[in-house]
Amino acid sequence: MIIAIDGPAASGKGTLGKRLAHHYHFRHLDTGVIYRAVAKALLDAGADPADEALAVAAALELDPEKFGHPALKTQTVGEVASVVSAFPRVREALLTFQRQFAAEPPGAVLDGRDIGTVICPEADVKIFVVADPVVRARRRTLEARSRGEEADEAVVLADILKRDERDRNRPIAPLKAAADAHVLDNSNLDIEAGLKAAIAIVEAVRAGR
């Protein structure tokens, strides 16, 4: 079984994906981490994030063992990741990796922005997570401060709105819900409530409802 979870930045899809995978004993892939890893590689090399050729080279040399690096969660890396993820050749370079991950039995949960529309259009269950931008900014600010980073909620909100605009309007794999996706509004749900709502969606699909 393949469960695709999509949604904008800081909507809670990553936490939901991880918890849902644990519930069903499936593998989990936060596909945003892949693009963040490419972004970090470019930043570490002092390369121009706008250079698509360099971004493709970084994508082809990714080391999955480094996907847990704490630096991948910084706002700077996130901003560059949003830029490189818009490059068609970068997305193509990472497509095979993601599809092979999804195909591994007994099942997988992948979260990102184009899982249900591009990466796994035949996914058994598709969930599109949404949340109010102000709520998302507050969550992202608290996450940053919990890591000891300085964060201004107004600045974070502006960045989120900018990323939403870029993600929704990019020509390749724009952020949008698949036609058969189940929309889950996460604005007023805590982690447990969000998980229960997602499980209800999965079970309804499995039961053919």
UniProtKB/Swiss-Prot annotation:
Subcellular location: Cytoplasm
EC number: 2.7.4.25
GO cellular component: cytoplasm
Binding site for ATP: G7, P8, A9, A10, S11, G12, K13, G14, T15
Record field: catalytic activity: CMP + ATP = CDP + ADP; dCMP + ATP = dCDP + ADP
Enzyme class, spelled out: transferase
Segments crossing the lipid bilayer: none
Domain of life: Bacteria
Coiled-coil region list: none
GO biological processes: pyrimidine nucleotide metabolic process
Keyword entries, A-Z: ATP-binding, Cytoplasm, Kinase, Nucleotide-binding, Transferase
GO molecular function: ATP binding; CMP kinase activity; dCMP kinase activity
Metal-binding among keywords: no
Family classification: Belongs to the cytidylate kinase family. Type 1 subfamily.
Protein name: Cytidylate kinase
Source organism: Nitrobacter hamburgensis (strain DSM 10229 / NCIMB 13809 / X14)
